[in-house]
């Protein structure tokens, strides 16, 4: 198996950027979801309720500054567009704590499951796409670990999918049947919720090895519970 794609979403709930290589730290891919949208009451706003955000793209500049459609995230133009979508006083906020993730820091998809899904895999918003995986083999991975060079990733469970899968990433047209199909054929779950056990650098093409057994279980427990 190998890494086919690496994705980062610097602005939570907007479209992301495809990378050739990335640093993986304890909170996932460096620079992922470091900015989010808040409404006038300070609540986090996502494309589940405001899908127009999917039509904007978040990236990082060479110096690590978040951009929205190529513009500084603090610019007046970006601020106006955010309020136009999410309402008066809605704004972008920078925050890099663990709470910025809906579930876990990494979402891993596989080519076999994507083929079974049969639609644009960007609807799944993965961080990593792993190639060389037969069919729905990923569904047997929870409890295991993925070794990518120096990086070790723990696989917790399958991701329960939400309404965002219904939106075409290019046209933003909503097709509820796609989300219904995920629930009908895959019990509502596609791709894997993962966390980082050992940090390091990864790149497209890197070999990925699935590990199981005691060593993986001990590493997983240490990462989750802080055990020595």
PLM regions with names:
Residues 1-228:
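Metal-cofactor-dependent catalytic cores
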């Amino acid at each position: 198996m190998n890494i086919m794609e690496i994705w980062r979403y610097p602005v939570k709930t907007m479209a992301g950027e495809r990378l050739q290589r990335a640093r993986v730290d304890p909170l996932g891919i460096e620079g992922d979801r470091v900015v989010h949208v808040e409404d006038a009451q300070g609540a986090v706003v996502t494309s589940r309720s405001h899908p127009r955000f999917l039509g904007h793209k978040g990236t990082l500049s060479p110096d690590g500054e978040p951009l929205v459609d190529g513009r500084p995230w603090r610019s007046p133009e970006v601020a106006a567009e955010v309020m136009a979508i999410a309402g008066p006083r809605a704004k972008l906020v920078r925050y890099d704590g663990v709470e910025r993730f809906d579930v876990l820091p990494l979402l891993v998809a596989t080519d076999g499951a994507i083929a079974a899904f049969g639609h644009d895999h960007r609807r799944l918003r993965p961080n990593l796409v792993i190639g060389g995986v037969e069919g729905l083999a990923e569904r047997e991975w929870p409890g295991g670990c993925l070794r990518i060079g120096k990086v070790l990733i723990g696989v917790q469970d399958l991701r329960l999918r939400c309404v965002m899968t219904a939106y075409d990433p290019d046209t933003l047209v909503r097709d509820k049947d796609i989300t219904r199909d995920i629930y009908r054929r895959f019990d509502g779950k596609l791709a894997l919720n993962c966390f980082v056990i050992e940090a390091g650098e990864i790149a497209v093409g890197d070999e990925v090895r699935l590990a199981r057994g005691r060593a993986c279980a001990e590493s997983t427990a240490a990462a989750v519970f802080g055990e020595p």
